[in-house]
Amino acid sequence: MQSTLNQLLTFIPLAFWFSYSTADGHGEADSNAYVLHSEYEIATGQDPATLSAELVEYQKNQEAYGFNNCGVYQHQFGTQRGFYTFCYFNDFDQLDAILKKSAASAAGPQSFADHSDNILEVQQRNLTISPEYIAYMRWDFDASLTLAERQQRADKLFDMFNTGFGGCNLYHHAWGGEMAHYMACGYTDYSDFGK
């Protein structure tokens, strides 16, 4: 029997920006084949606005290190975690250069309770602009399924959500112990979400 764990999270954007500067070698030719996806949990008693400001500044630094574009969303419903960040990159050579450049910077004190990082492969991209809100989903399929069967199920779910939302991205876990698929679907407001 197939069991599927789905987490549906809704986010509001804090900041979003694109870095398409030809001076740093990035431009419309960027493939953005991968994304560094991170989730941050707000510490007990912490002011979310403080962490929000820190993450926006952190994402700006990530772009300065060489990521193609980065952004921050704040969780609104569905989980204890407080913020979702992402930074796109083309390949692991670019990621290696970014990590070497960022290693020299000093890390400040940790102001969040917990966080997780995942490197995801972009499988399908239909979100062409930063949506006002996103519904973020993670799908873990039963371990008895083959990789091809998991992908078939993810593709079916993606087709359904992409049709319903009018634009979604599909990702697959590219590094680490998870065998999950992820989706981000955009909408303009809750009236749009309800349709």
Question: Would you name each region that the model predicts?
Answer:
Residues 9-17:
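Bacterial N-terminal signal peptides
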Residues 17-195:
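Short S/T/G/P-rich N-terminal loop/turn motif that feeds into the first structured element of a domain
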Residues 1-10:
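Bacterial N-terminal signal peptides that target proteins for export
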